[in-house]
């Protein structure tokens, strides 16, 4: 079991209850997409799973342990086994791409090796290889400020893949990419998860991409799990109620539910 949540609540410091009574189990090697309207709690849920935020109530198990019963050092060691791909990767503007990708290993290296890597990248071939999978090998020595939003997202993905985590979390990882590139990139993430038996959990606004690439779909609304279904069982009525009052036309929902349902990986 990779993830287990039981009666989880999470309240932000401003008093907002972002997650309410979540019960969820995800097995090792599963590929799960989280969908739902803006403000539903998708990003908060991923941060909870990454052990970046503690629950306010309930029981949480990540990779076999409760992160918040560990010491700070033990929790940091746990986080080195987890990668979180951000929608807007926090990459320093003047940092070179090779250094940004190599940073995926910082949690696994000692202080001395980490500092040395900042001065002189220690594994240029490894960084180049993972960037090549994302068609970015030619950007190896460019600065992050020279890249487009979609390219920065792919650098963030490359860093996560270079880290080689057991649990891969992705928060809107392809939102800045054109449809074709987004499709290709999600296929690559899924294939990586299959080949390495990695648990992959991704939040996506593009319902059609979620249904096309992920065998299991979790719909989240108002901090609650609205449905948890195999992709092939997600129907129009599920999406209608999930996105009620949102900017998703009935025609779009119908097309998604009827034509895009079989996972590709």
From Swiss-Prot:
Residues 3-247 form the ABC transporter domain. Keywords: ATP-binding, Cell inner membrane, Cell membrane, Membrane, Nucleotide-binding, Phosphonate transport, Translocase, Transport. This is Phosphonates import ATP-binding protein PhnC 1. Pfam families: ABC_tran. Its EC number is 7.3.2.2. Part of the ABC transporter complex PhnCDE involved in phosphonates import. Responsible for energy coupling to the transport system. It comes from Pseudomonas syringae pv. tomato (strain ATCC BAA-871 / DC3000). One of its GO terms (molecular function) is ABC-type phosphonate transporter activity. PANTHER family: AMINO ACID IMPORT ATP-BINDING PROTEIN, PHOSPHONATES IMPORT ATP-BINDING PROTEIN PHNC. One of its GO terms (cellular component) is plasma membrane. The lineage of its organism: Bacteria, Pseudomonadati, Pseudomonadota, Gammaproteobacteria, Pseudomonadales.
